[in-house]
């Protein structure tokens, strides 16, 4: 008799679903379906419906069992989570009761050498979540030294970004940098780490992954889309894993949760009513038991907010001036 498959337990899963507070008959969006942990927990509440979104076709295929088990209450859509408003509209769910997001790379992606996300497993230098668009190997081969340095500094917060970029450009003159191990070896020669510190290539790999998948642009767009689709009283829960993501979520909710501001030096400015009420004044973090069971959970942060009845705030904010995948790949 074969043992049943181990069910994926998402980081801060219990806390995130508690923040959503699923109710019978509610419609929820699992914007980063992954292995389906959040969806399964939401579906445990009677008569709930879940729209699961993931840009990774492997995740969508892997969720077929849960779709069948749910009796039609789970619908899976292969798409970017920045498109969640359009996905919801296509499923006759223009307004929903909750949205949960688990931002960044999944354990499944990290643990599969062929996906090229991890410096710990040798494989092709790919890093694409969807399988579409330029690979990390193509970025490393074509980006200028200046662009590489900016990418590694901005998205990886690597202080030695210029030295890493210089080493990459020097190495690629002798042949393609096609594997994760090849890149990790190049970075390790210029970034030194003590035994108790993170691997020297950690920040460079993070930077390339974020850049290849346009993760921060996607997150900004997804937060705004969630604001548009949530009903009054609907809830948003976001789990992030590094400071760049968490800062975006924190700033978005802080801006959307303010009623105005001013001081004796500066009169209060007129602004729209807040579209969110913050539920987590400080982010929730994993307990010791969860970190011990899953060391990758150590950096996780959960922030949540409840949608007010105010209109979504269209502030026309532009994306920050960081390197663009399209511009870098065409040499612009």
UniProtKB/Swiss-Prot annotation:
NCBIfam families: 16S rRNA (cytosine(1402)-N(4))-methyltransferase RsmH. It catalyses: cytidine(1402) in 16S rRNA + S-adenosyl-L-methionine = N(4)-methylcytidine(1402) in 16S rRNA + S-adenosyl-L-homocysteine + H(+). The gene is rsmH. The keyword rRNA-binding does not apply. The keyword Transferase applies. Its EC number is 2.1.1.199. PANTHER family: 12S RRNA N4-METHYLCYTIDINE METHYLTRANSFERASE, S-ADENOSYL-METHYLTRANSFERASE MRAW. It is found in: Cytoplasm. Belongs to the methyltransferase superfamily. RsmH family. GO terms for biological process: rRNA base methylation. GO terms for molecular function: rRNA (cytosine-N4-)-methyltransferase activity. It is an enzyme of class 2 (transferase). Keywords: Cytoplasm, Methyltransferase, rRNA processing, S-adenosyl-L-methionine, Transferase. It comes from Nitrobacter winogradskyi (strain ATCC 25391 / DSM 10237 / CIP 104748 / NCIMB 11846 / Nb-255). Specifically methylates the N4 position of cytidine in position 1402 (C1402) of 16S rRNA. Transmembrane segments: none annotated. GO terms for cellular component: cytoplasm. It comes from the Bacteria. InterPro entries: RsmH (IPR002903), SAM-dep_MeTrfase_MraW_recog (IPR023397), SAM-dependent_MTases_sf (IPR029063). This is Ribosomal RNA small subunit methyltransferase H. S-adenosyl-L-methionine binds at residues 36-38, 54, 81, 102, 109. Pfam families: Methyltransf_5.
């Amino acid at each position: 008799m074969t043992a049943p498959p181990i069910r994926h337990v998402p980081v801060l899963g219990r806390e995130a679903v508690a923040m959503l507070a699923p109710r019978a008959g509610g419609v929820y969006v699992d914007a980063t379906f992954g292995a389906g942990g959040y969806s399964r927990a939401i579906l445990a509440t009677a008569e709930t419906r879940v729209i699961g979104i993931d840009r990774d076709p492997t995740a969508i295929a892997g969720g077929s069992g849960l779709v069948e088990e749910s009796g039609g209450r789970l619908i899976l859509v292969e798409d970017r989570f920045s498109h969640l408003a359009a996905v919801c509209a296509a499923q006759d769910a223009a307004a929903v009761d909750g949205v949960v997001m688990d931002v960044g790379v999944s354990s499944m992606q990290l643990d599969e050498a062929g996906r090229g996300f991890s410096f710990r497993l040798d494989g092709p230098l790919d890093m694409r979540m969807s399988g579409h668009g330029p690979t990390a190997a193509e970025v490393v081969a074509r980006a200028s030294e200046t662009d590489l340095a900016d990418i590694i500094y901005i998205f990886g917060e690597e202080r030695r970004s210029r030295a890493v970029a210089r080493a990459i450009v020097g190495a690629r003159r002798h042949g393609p940098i096609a594997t994760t191990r090849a890149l990790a070896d190049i970075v390790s020669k210029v970034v030194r780490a003590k035994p108790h510190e993170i691997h020297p290539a950690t920040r460079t790999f993070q930077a390339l992954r974020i850049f290849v998948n346009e993760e921060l642009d996607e997150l900004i767009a997804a937060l705004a889309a969630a604001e548009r689709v949530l009903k009054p009283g609907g809830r948003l829960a976001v789990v992030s894993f590094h400071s760049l993501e968490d800062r975006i979520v924190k700033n978005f909710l802080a801006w959307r949760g303010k009623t105005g501001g001013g001081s004796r030096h500066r009169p209060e400015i007129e602004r729209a009513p807040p579209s969110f009420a913050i539920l987590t004044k400080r982010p929730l973090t994993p307990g010791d038991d969860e970190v011990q069971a899953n060391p990758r959970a150590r950096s996780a942060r959960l922030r949540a907010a409840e949608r007010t009845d105010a209109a979504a705030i269209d502030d026309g904010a532009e994306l920050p001036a960081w390197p663009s995948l399209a511009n870098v790949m065409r040499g612009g």
